[in-house]
């Protein structure tokens, strides 16, 4: 009887020791899981003000400014009230990038126009943050048709077309390759608008650069007449336009050099079944009408 009691006592002691390794293993697994869930710290910016939150101030002006977003590592547009605020506020996109964004890897949008719809055709309708009332067209992915909407005049996204035909050609019935006609751009002296005159020579463009280089020039909503530059994605060149002083979009540069640096290197032109002859541009003294021409010829 005594031996039997000792035997069962030993069994109980052994069974009592079994859960200990199991719980230890669970703790080790739990500790390992916690370690893998830890996110690396954000990179510290060169200037402390680059990490400040956007501050439009207490006043009620409507001034376009730029700030550095520490979460996305990109310079973004905001509307400044005109007084107070903080140092994370820049007059131009280039100044913001120079002060805050140069220490971070460039985050670019890689777009390749191939067979099928471009990615931006699947974006939802976006009127932007401004208060304009401009008729535009977007591709509705639910109805599979291009539809009309009212655009505010600034920001928004690339699913935004000036004509129904342009929307249909791009998103409803895309061609095998996204082709853009070579254009002759003229400055209209009456209302300072850009008129594109297509020629017969098509070109293909492969874009590997920032998405803000793609929208057309946007004068904005105010009454000023500041000379700015925008990247014309149709002809692959930086062109001047008159900016009103507020609103507009990000395709807006204070100098031609800044425009070329940001956008021009992103486009790679390829001629179709022919050689490309680059014609020299002659500078004219008359600021009234500026014409730029590129000619295509077939190889013999």
UniProtKB/Swiss-Prot annotation:
Site, Reactive bond: residue positions? 60-61, 131-132, 223-224
Question: In terms of domain of life, where is this protein from?
Answer: Eukaryota
Signal peptide residues are 1-24
Per its database record, what is this protein's job? Inhibits factor X (X(a)) directly and, in a Xa-dependent way, inhibits VIIa/tissue factor activity, presumably by forming a quaternary Xa/LACI/VIIa/TF complex. It possesses an antithrombotic action and also the ability to associate with lipoproteins in plasma.
Query: Domain notes, please?
Result: This inhibitor contains three inhibitory domains. The first domain interacts with VIIa and TF, the second one with Xa.
Which PANTHER family does this one have? Answer: KUNITZ-TYPE PROTEASE INHIBITOR-RELATED, TISSUE FACTOR PATHWAY INHIBITOR
Q: What is this protein called?
A: Tissue factor pathway inhibitor
Q: Which gene encodes it?
A: TFPI
């Amino acid at each position: 009887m005594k031996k039997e009691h000792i035997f069962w006592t030993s069994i109980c002691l052994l069974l009592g020791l079994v859960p200990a390794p199991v719980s230890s293993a669970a703790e080790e697994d739990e500790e390992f899981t916690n370690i893998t869930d830890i996110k690396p710290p954000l990179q510290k910016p060169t200037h402390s003000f680059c990490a400040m939150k956007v501050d439009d101030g207490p006043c009620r002006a409507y001034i376009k400014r730029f700030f550095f977003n520490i979460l996305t590592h990109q310079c973004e547009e905001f509307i400044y009230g005109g007084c107070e605020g903080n140092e994370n506020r820049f007059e131009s996109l280039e100044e913001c990038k120079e002060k805050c964004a140069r220490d971070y890897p460039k985050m670019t949008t890689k777009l390749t126009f191939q067979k099928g719809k471009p990615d931006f055709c699947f974006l939802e309708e976006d009127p932007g943050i401004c208060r304009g009332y401009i008729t535009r067209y977007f591709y509705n992915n639910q109805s599979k048709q291009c539809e009309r909407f009212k655009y505010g005049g600034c920001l928004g996204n690339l699913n935004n077309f000036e004509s129904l035909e342009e929307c249909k050609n791009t998103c409803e019935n895309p061609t095998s390759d996204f082709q853009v006609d070579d254009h002759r751009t003229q400055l209209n002296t009456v209302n300072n608008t850009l008129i594109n005159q297509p020629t017969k020579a098509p070109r293909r463009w492969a874009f590997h650069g920032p998405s803000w280089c793609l929208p057309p020039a946007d004068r904005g909503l105010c009454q000023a007449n500041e000379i700015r530059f925008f990247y014309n994605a149709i002809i692959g060149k930086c062109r001047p336009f008159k900016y009103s002083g507020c609103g507009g979009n990000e395709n807006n540069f204070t100098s031609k050099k800044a425009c070329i640096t940001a956008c021009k290197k992103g486009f790679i032109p390829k001629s179709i079944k022919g050689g490309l002859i680059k014609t020299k541009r002659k500078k004219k003294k008359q600021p009234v009408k500026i014409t730029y021409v590129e000619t295509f010829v077939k190889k013999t």
